[in-house]
Curated annotation (Swiss-Prot):
Keywords: Metal-binding, Ribonucleoprotein, Ribosomal protein, RNA-binding, rRNA-binding, Zinc
Native source species: Campylobacter fetus subsp. fetus (strain 82-40)
Transmembrane segments: none
Pfam families given in the database record: Ribosomal_L31
Name of protein: Large ribosomal subunit protein bL31
Length: 66
């Protein structure tokens, strides 16, 4: 590898929206994620409802669509 051309590989803190944190390695010192293994439905066995219909309704209302 050539010297001084690669980004520094440091230990980083990964923070999930659910509040779970863990450490990993990355070029950044801090990473924020929306979902992790502690809150993902596949790992928890529970179902999580995503409110995508609300976004569509908001868009239609904003642009006066029917």
């Amino acid at each position: 590898m050539k010297k001084d051309i690669h980004p520094e590989y440091v230990e980083c803190t990964v923070t999930c929206a659910c509040g779970n944190t863990f450490t990993s390695k990355s070029n950044k010192s801090e990473i924020r994620v929306d979902i992790c293994s502690e809150c993902h439905p596949f790992f928890t066995g529970s179902e999580k409802i995503v409110d995508s219909a609300g976004r569509v309704d908001k868009f239609k209302k904003k642009y006066n669509m029917k």
